[in-house]
Structures are given as structure tokens and as C-alpha cells.
Amino acid sequence: MSTRTVFRVHPTVNFARFGTSEDFYLSPETSAGMDLPGTRTTGGLPVKAGTEATFIDRGDLRDGDGRLKRQAARFRLYAYDLDRPDRYPNGSGTEIVAGTRLADGRTVERIVWTVHLANKKANNYNIVSSMGVQAFADGQVPQLRNPQAYGTPDSPSRLKALVIDPGPRAIIGTRGVEGEGPVRFNAETTAACSDGKGGVTPLPAYPMTFPSGQLYQPTGPLDTLGELRTDEKGRLLVLAAHGRTAAQIDEYGVPVQLVGDTNNAGWFDDAADGPVSATLVFTDGTTEEAFAAWVVCCDPGYAPQIRNVVSVWDDVYDTWVRELGLQPDLCDPATGAFQPGYRPGFEQHIRPIFRAAALQRWTVNLPPIAQAAHAAVDSIGPGDNPDRTIMAGLTFIRNPNANPAESGVGVPLMPLSLGDAGMPFLTVTRTQYFFLEQWSRHLFRTTGGDAPLGPGEALDMASLSNCLGGRYVPGIEVSFTIRQPDIYIQDWRETGAGPFRIKPKLLDYTTAKAGTPFLSGGWIPLRDDRQGLEPGDLAKFMAVPWQTDYNSCSIHQTSINTAGANAATGNPLTLYWSWPAQRPDAVHVADDVVDNVLAAQKWSIRGPGTFAINPRSASTFQDPLDAVEKWDRIGIILQGTAIDGTTSPDYYLEVESRLEGPGDPDSPVLPWPFSANPSPPAPQPRPHGTGHRRGR
């Protein structure tokens, strides 16, 4: 077979994050919480704008006026020379920038990037957190959001009124002192796309749609979904919008109430997602198309170095291993059974699980004995005998393959976080558990692991590993649909696309007509639909507005997912955490630390309007409208090395909170276990325009 060169955009999925500032830093390109060579700083930190890999520090989080900076998703191009069907890991890949000379003698003159962002949340179906993807099984669908708008998700009237679609935007990346942009996703900027020949085609007839009519917009107009820029080497930067919301005005002339955490009719936000494509233009006039990536515009990273026990990477990797034949030496594609002779690498497959367990202490209220136990887990090394460690026999790990009753057992089983889709407690993925089983059986490699990842593949893993997995109710960056095999390009070995790449639906922009919606209701799960995803088809399964979901998913009873109690204790009132690594609950504040001695914890969300009569509502804004307006005041957890020159690198502390007050002395952070009140008081009436918080 002759050698062919293919081009791919990496990361396959990257994340732009909201901020109220015009300023920004760059998406992290290292994996949260993991050791990095030559430094005490662990992975997950974003990168300073205008640099290759310089980590941000405390001073980079906010601008001079105290506004929260945005995180730009940086995309790169890589070339792969393939002489056979592809494999994973490929281990190769050479970055391509403007000015790169290829082995065949061609030189890249410029890169034409096209991105299409959209928000379909208000036109989608309600999210049923207790069911997850199963709410779409057997041809069924949940109730539509905004049912007062007549029709189906494909009805033109609903598409015009409920979908935010500015259309595609194009930008040309060249080599220079400064990059290009911004090119904004607003109504004033003409839609455009690559013409496939090295230029850009304007689309003046593209039917843009934004929320219209009389609207309540508490933090500014919802008039953009973000912007594009390039850097000095022609790489792409995608910036999210500013985390704004808009609500329709009801018949009484007041904003529609926020009545829940996930599905709020009459509300919009500026989250978005969509495909990222690239056309390489060479000095000889020829062009090449790269395999596209996907961008998601989402919540800020409030704890970028705190690793999730189950990350999006763990879920995506598990799906590809067990259902898409990613690594036949690990899992038999014919039977779906793990290969008993496979030996995971300790540093590659085991260490991340142990490290994640240890890092949870910085965002939850663990008692000292639990902190010590988690530290003991993190201290396990590749040379230790598994039988002589605290993890001997995996006694404390909840088995995802076991009798379903085990999912209802809390202490002493780990993780001690809540599950999703009706499961009381979180489990590691089946692939993660297999790695742990092999380690427990002494069937692991103390050095090395699978073949090393290539640089583009490493970006894929790092990007996804910095996001919340496991508990999609509906999630923070993405939802349960990320685990569905049919959203991905599956013929990647033959085409050279590489794994983990979302399949974009082919869109012919030349057919766009003013006044006629261009996008449809789009993809829904558990259907025989292999056309691919349209812009907006990932984010539409998230909460609307996103702030109410972030606010509510803090501390809960197990009955939030089932009617039962913790099977280990029989106590239905014991409280547990939802998203502790991505949505901090209890934190140590850096400014309270004296001589590297930690002070008492405080709630991440604190100050006026946060006092909770019932402990299950701690660390939340009691009025959800406060969450919509004050989300940007929440502090960020950083490692000591990114705070100042004196803080211990072993500490991960909150900095730059702008919430008023030091914390309510009547709402202290008590060490776990703690319980909800047995009989919470009836909710008090709220004025129009607000709603009552409902714990999920």
C-alpha cells in the first residue's frame, strides 16, 4: 500500500469557556492533576495567551476591572503519513502551521478555518435526569421544551423562534507577528465559509436567528455566540460568548420564572457547539481538506487541575474500547470481552484514577480520616505490591459490573459521588475497572504502557480528561450523548480520520435562503441516524440556562436519583456530592492561609443570599436568579505554584472570588458525613421573575 498524507484538526473536541471579560487565555493542553516533567505544577492549567505553553497564574484569571477572562479553545493541524489502515495509538503526527514545508515539497501558505456555532437548547426535548439516554429508547421522546411553541423540532416556526443560529464564520490563518480577528458570531457579521479553493465565500442570505421580542437580559444582550481569531502561526482560536441569558416576558409584563434546574421554558443562554474545519492552501495553489474537529462553548473551569474520577475522556475511551473496536488487544471487538492477557501501564492507566481520588479533598468537606485514606491511595507507586496497599482486593471500589444493588451502597465503596440515570452512586467505567482488576492481579506494567501517544492524540486525551464525566444530569461541558457510538466517525481506520472524532453532517451552505431556517431539529440518540451532527446538537442536551444547573448540582441525598437510601446505612438523609471536581463545594481560601497552615473551609458559593436552612442547599445561591447574575464572581481553585511564590505546591486553593462577605458564620462547613433536615420548611413565596431552587 502506498503512503498517503492526511491532515487532522486536534484536539478532536475542545472547549471554549465563558467569561465576562473581552480578554482571554488558552485552553489547557495537559491532563488535570497529573505530574509533568521538570516542574511541581500538575496538569490542567490553561495557557497564557500569546504563548506556546506558559501556564496562567492567579493574576491571569481576571482583567483589570475584575471581570472573569474567557478560555479560548486553541486548535492545531497535524499531518499523518499512513501506509496501512490506521491504528490507535498511532504515535506519530507532525504539526502543520502557516509556512510549514511538507516532505513532498509543498509549503503551507495559509489555512482557511470554518466554524459553525449554534444553540438549539430551547427547541430540544426536556432532559429527564433520572433516565438519561433511555428517555429516547424504543422510539420515545420526552416532552419538548417550550411546548407552547406549536410543532415539532423541525417545524420552521419553532426553528425561527427557538434556535440561536448565526451561521458559519471563516477566518484565514497566516504567518505573521499577530493573528487575525476577531470574527464574531453576531447578527452584524456576515456569515461565511471556506470555498474549498483557498478563499472565503460570503453568505449574505444566510438566515440568522437570535432571541427576539421583548426580553429580560439581566447581564447584557444575548447577541453573539462567540468569535474566531488566529494566532501568529495560523492556528485557530475559538472564543465563547459571555455567559449571558435571556428570558421571555410573560403576560403580566415580568420575566418568565426559573422553575427548575434543567428545563426552563422561555429562557435562552449563549452556550453553543459546532464543527471546526480547515482547508490548507499551498504556495503552488493546491489545497487539502483536514478532518474536522468539534468545539463546545460552556461553563468556566472553576477547578482546572482537580481531576474527575471519571472524566469525559474516561467515558469516551470506554465507549471506543468496548463498542467501537479501538484496541483489539485490550477488548475483543467480536465479543466485547476484555482480553485477560492485556497489561495496563501503571502511570498511563492506574495512576490517573488514584490521583483523582486524592484531589477531591480540595473541593469537598472530607473529614481528616478520609483525607488520609485518599492520600494513601495517591501514594501507591508502580513498585508497590497491590496486596499490601490500601486498595488491596479493590475492597473499596464500586464494581460497575456487579449486581445493580451494589450501586446503592455508599460507604465504604468509592467513588462517594452521586451517579446518573437512576443510579444512586457513581462507578468508574468498565474499562477503568478492568485496569484496576489487572493491577490487583499483578498483571500490569510498572513502566511504559500502550505505544506512546502522538502529539495530536495527546491533545485529544488532555482536552477530554479536563471535563466532567460519569454523572450527566445533564452535565457541565457535554451530556450523556457523548457516550453514544453513532455520533462518531467509525470508518476512521480506512479514511485516516483517527478516533474520537465527531461526525459532522454535510451542510451545503450554497442552499441557504433568507427567511428559511437552514438547520433542522438535528440528531437525537437511539435512532438509526448516521448522517452526523449539526451545529448545536451536543449543547442542546444541556440545561437551559446553564447557570441554574451549575448552581443546583452541589450536595444531595441519594433519593435525588432513586426512591431508596444508602444501602450501607439505610439513611436517606445523608448528603453526597454531585460534581466535586468540576463544581467545587467546600474550599480552602488562599488568602486565609498563613505560613502554609490551612484555615477552615468555606463554601465555594457564599455570602449574602446563600444561607441555607437545610444543609442540602448549602453552597448555592438560594434564588436561582442570583446564579444567572453572579456566576462570574465564584472563585477559581489553583495549585499553590500558580498562586504565589510561597504557597505549598501540595495545596489547591481558591483565589479571586468576588462573592461578597467572608462566608456566613451561621452556615459553617461541617466535615462529612452530614445530613439533610428531615422536614424542610415550606418554600417562601418569591416575587415574579425568580423561582424556587429545586435540588436535583
Predicted features by range, described:
Residues 2-696:
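Aromatic- and Gly/Pro-enriched helix-to-coil junctions and flexible linker segments
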